[in-house]
Amino acid sequence: MHATTTILKAMSASERTQAARQGAAALADGQLVGFATETVYGVGAVANNPSAMERLRELKDRPKRPFSVHLAEPEDVHLYVADVPPLARRLIAKAWPGPLTLILPVGGQLAERRFARAGLYDVLCWQDTIGLRCPDLELAREMLSGVDWPVVAPSANLAGTKSARSAKDVLKALDGRIDLLIDSGPTRYGQDSTVVQVEGDTWRVMRDGVYSQRQIARLLRRTLLFVCTGNTCRSALAAGLARKMLAERLACPSGKLAAAGWEVLSAGG
């Protein structure tokens, strides 16, 4: 007999609350759950359930490379990465919850001992890095908060096909191959999250998405604003001196400070 996917409608506030609870329970039970984020629909599985992970790998035709972990709250990053790079902290503060996946160095072991003892490093990490995302959709985050173990969630489509923007798209590709689908309507952006890898003081965009590379650079930029209330001319003078000193410290021309992630402004004339 052909299996079918159970569909939960989640359009009203009460339906969304109930769907989040049922989704969390299904994940904890080892089921594959389709759900919306602000970008595209994803398929979630709990990482400490080998059977669920095997089904997800088969579904996505991805036998080895790990899937990104989806977080209920931005501060949950510290469950996985003990030493979050400053650049990543800046992106988290400005762009999470939101359409940004970060690939961060782990440092040899997961920060949360319970996860480490369960052997989840090998499940979640690749070349000592981990992919993390905090979606900007209340239903998704409420569901994730109801699960005690890491939830991974790749896009709800077959490998090589377009990401699903609606529950209808998910069913077209995955009906009968996932256990539960929470239908909360079309996604806000209809495109994938931007993937950025951060290591030390360097970063690079690994996959284009909602945020462009220019927007990521702007999010990372640090701004120095000089305001001299007694004499506005001094603001411009102070800004000029700061540009010169900063350029010397960074060993770059003052005209390249923006490219290095700095913006020096004056509130005076």
Regions found by a protein language model. Name each.
Residues 223-269:
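Conserved active-site segments centered on acidic
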Residues 1-227:
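Active-site-adjacent structural elements in enzyme catalytic cores
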